[in-house]
């Protein structure tokens, strides 16, 4: 996907977006139908209130506002039932429950009166209705005129729950969403700041790898998404409408954060930046195809939700073919993740300290997303679903980010730290399939962020990759009368030179040669690259060469 695909996709989605039927709704309806749906709202059991303003030509009299609730004998029994006509749909209404508002001057509670505009008579109705029920319920508002010549209505409705800023314009299934989003925003800001601090430490140690940068990017996008959600819901709390474009952008960023994090997990499972420096060409193609497919299904999911979801039904995002396709892709990603981790552990068993908790923690995460979607579709009551799903979804994202932040913290006490190869070593690899040397963890060498560890600088790596002290002196070339010292793991220890011609430190000087002239050239220690890239420098000496 090219660099301009992101803005283009955003404009496409915004173009598909329809104006949301918010808790303040207005419109102008003209249709040949005799029964139509207007809007829905989830009222509290005691504080629900509908304020309305209706106006229509007196010649179109008489029209009715019908109030259905979510009982199986009410709204589900009439909506999209082609075998029922207008009268049958009105018959399920219980007049004793005041579920009918007759828009005429004869019905006092409708507040209707005849007005004149441009020589034409109109019925203008301004009034309200309170709602009482045994629990929170979805209420559906419809307009009818059975046996007439169609419907015509100019309407304006305000649906509220109490007078508090946190509840007034919110449907009962949305209670707590704004507070929840604000709380998680603050938590994710803390996670982002901690990840930036850890990234600064890792950069100083040349351990700030691409996968950790992806984690920081995912956390940053998550923060931006939650910020936009808070802006949307805050504006919605004030006017009951909100800015739907901000909500769509927030959803896009939320999905982008999820996709970045998912890609990072698959890359880490394959050992990228932990046991290998690059992904093979075939692996890169597979990842590109998979992420493209996942992005397309997410896009289709957004378009389907915005364009094809029926506002007269309470639907969840994943209640669509694209939603179930997303769940299937999530399971496919988990299978890929399992295979990648097992292969990595097979070749690098010393990385079990990282990969075992990593695999266990994110197995729960991989299953949490589709299980949440299935429970939301079939197990949570519709009048409470949106607020519950919002909290669970944010909790799942928080779990994923918090676990990664903990297991990758750059602390000497962290035995799960995954990185041991410096970023400067990855860039000089010659083959894309070349693996890192077998080494447990570079984290055990963390002593200071700013001062080099001189002891490790002059240590010699053993065959298993760990640093070992020098037990035998390395015979540097010496000449007559030259005292020489040998470095060991204790930088202050001086070792006497070996026996030279049977006399310690003494050798005959050839005739005609001064002591100074007999000195042979000493060569600086050279750093030799072995197979892979050892973490520490080692000292090697060159043989004596004549002047």
UniProtKB/Swiss-Prot annotation:
Residue ranges crossing the lipid bilayer per the database entry: 2-22, 182-202, 214-234, 248-268, 283-303, 325-345, 356-376, 388-408
UniProt subcellular location: Membrane
One Pfam family matching this protein: TMEM145_N
Record's keyword terms, sorted: Glycoprotein, Membrane, Transmembrane, Transmembrane helix
Biological processes, Gene Ontology terms: G protein-coupled receptor signaling pathway; response to pheromone
Domain of life: Eukaryota
Residues bearing glycans: 28, 102, 243, 443, 453, 464
InterPro entries: GPR180-like_N, GPR180/TMEM145, GPR180/TMEM145_TM
Protein name listed in UniProt: Transmembrane protein 145
Species annotation: Xenopus laevis
């Amino acid at each position: 996907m090219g660099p301009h695909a992101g803005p283009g996709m955003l404009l496409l989605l915004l173009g598909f977006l329809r104006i949301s039927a918010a808790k303040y709704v207005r419109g102008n309806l003209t249709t040949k139908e005799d029964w139509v749906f207007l809007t829905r709202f989830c009222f509290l059991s005691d504080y629900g209130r509908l304020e309305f303003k209706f106006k229509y030509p007196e010649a179109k009299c008489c029209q009715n506002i019908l109030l259905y609730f979510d009982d199986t004998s009410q709204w589900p029994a009439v909506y999209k039932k082609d075998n029922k006509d207008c009268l049958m749909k009105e018959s399920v209404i219980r007049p004793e429950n005041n579920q009918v508002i007759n828009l005429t001057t004869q019905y006092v509670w409708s507040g209707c009166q005849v007005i004149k505009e441009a020589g034409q008579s109109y019925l203008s109705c301004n009034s309200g209705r309170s709602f009482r029920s045994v629990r929170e319920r979805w209420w559906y508002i419809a307009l009818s005129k059975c046996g007439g010549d169609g419907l015509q209505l100019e309407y304006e409705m305000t649906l509220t729950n109490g007078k508090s800023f946190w509840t007034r314009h919110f449907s009962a299934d949305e209670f707590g969403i704004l507070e929840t989003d604000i709380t998680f925003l603050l938590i994710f800001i803390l996670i982002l700041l901690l990840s930036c601090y850890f990234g600064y430490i890792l950069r100083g140690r040349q351990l700030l790898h691409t996968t950790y940068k992806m984690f920081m990017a995912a956390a940053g996008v998550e923060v931006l998404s939650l910020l936009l959600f808070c802006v949307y819901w805050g504006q919605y709390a004030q006017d009951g409408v909100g800015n739907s474009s901000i909500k769509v952008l927030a959803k896009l960023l939320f999905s982008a954060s999820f996709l970045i994090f998912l890609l990072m997990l698959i890359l880490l499972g394959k050992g990228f930046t932990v046991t290998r420096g690059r992904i093979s060409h075939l692996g890169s193609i597979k990842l590109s195809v998979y992420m493209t497919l996942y992005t397309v299904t997410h896009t289709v999911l957004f378009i389907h939700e915005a364009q094809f979801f029926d506002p007269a039904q309470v639907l969840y995002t994943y209640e669509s073919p694209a939603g179930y396709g997303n769940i299937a892709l999530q399971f496919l990603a988990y299978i890929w993740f399992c295979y990648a981790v097992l292969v990595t552990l097979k070749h690098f068993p010393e990385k079990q300290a990282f990969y075992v908790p990593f695999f266990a923690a994110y197995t729960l995460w991989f299953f949490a997303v589709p299980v949440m979607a299935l429970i939301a579709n079939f197990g949570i009551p519709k009048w409470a679903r949106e607020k519950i799903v919002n909290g669970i979804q944010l909790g799942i994202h928080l779990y994923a980010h918090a676990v990664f932040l903990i297991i990758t913290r750059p602390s000497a006490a962290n035995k799960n730290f995954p990185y041991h190869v410096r970023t400067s070593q990855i860039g000089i690899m010659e083959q894309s399939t070349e693996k890192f040397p077998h080494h447990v963890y570079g984290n055990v060498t963390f002593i200071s962020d700013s001062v080099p560890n001189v002891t490790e600088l002059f240590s010699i790596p053993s065959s298993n990759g760990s640093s070992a002290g020098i037990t035998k002196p390395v015979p540097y070339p010496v000449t007559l009368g030259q005292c020489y010292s040998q470095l060991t793991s204790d930088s202050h220890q001086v070792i006497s030179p070996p026996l030279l011609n049977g006399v310690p430190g003494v050798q005959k000087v050839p005739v005609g040669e001064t002591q100074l002239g007999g000195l042979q050239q000493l060569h600086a220690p050279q750093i030799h690259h072995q197979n892979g890239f050892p973490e520490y420098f080692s000292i090697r000496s060159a043989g004596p060469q004549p002047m």
